Amino acid sequence: MRELSINNNSKLFALLLNIYNPKENFEITKNYFKSENPSDLIHSAQKTDCDILALRFNVLSLDELPKAVSLLRALLPYITKPLMICGTGKKEIDEKLLPELMKVLDREQCIISFATENTYKSILPSVIAGNHYVVLKTPIDINLAKELNILSVDMGLSLDKIIMNTDIGGLGYGYEYGYSMMEKVKLESPKDDYLSFPIISDASVESLKTKEARFDNFPDSWGELLKRAEMIELSSCAGAIAAGANIVVVNNPESIKFLRELV
């Protein structure tokens, strides 16, 4: 099992898989793996060049928690890459789901993604007890990011277990604001202990949600849809790297080889 070390100099790539409901993976993910079986996905992902394997448990309701926990327990023996556990992004689910998933983890130093100002009180106790990293996600605002970092440390979270997600849009102004926010944090971090943390970017996830990456009703000059989506992922990730992201989430393993040449 590989050790995970994350700091402000890290340049790591996390491969994201919607493992609970693989049908929700982006087309560029489906096209690469050509399977929607969780075991097959894990087996294939282990052979990729990703530094971190990010598994998203995209349950629809609290009734599905036992099934999600059972799935993680069944997959853990086959996972040797550093692991990131991702929730749904919905407060009422994640504050229950993530602690339950952490109970069955058979290793320390996993990344738990993510806690917000609305969920950190429910999620952090399990993070601390399991000696895991946690992604603290805030809207695009440096003061809110710093505040959540301080509140988390006050709860007992070690400084070296914090990873920041300062949020970003998928396209246009939202992407530009998110890019500028990462730059600002990196500029301020040398003189502020509560901003001096690694940053994770899921810009590719947001970019692949846009209509430009999902629909084929564009002029021929835009190119074939699948190739266009691949280029959108590469472009969004390249910008995040330039802005200073230490961990970049990708959905297509083939993106990693190209992106490594940028760091």
Where are these regions (language model features)?
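Catalytic beta/alpha-barrel core
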Residues: 53-58, 62-64, 82-93, 107-120, ...
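Catalytic alpha/beta core domains of metabolic enzymes, predominantly
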Residues: 118-262
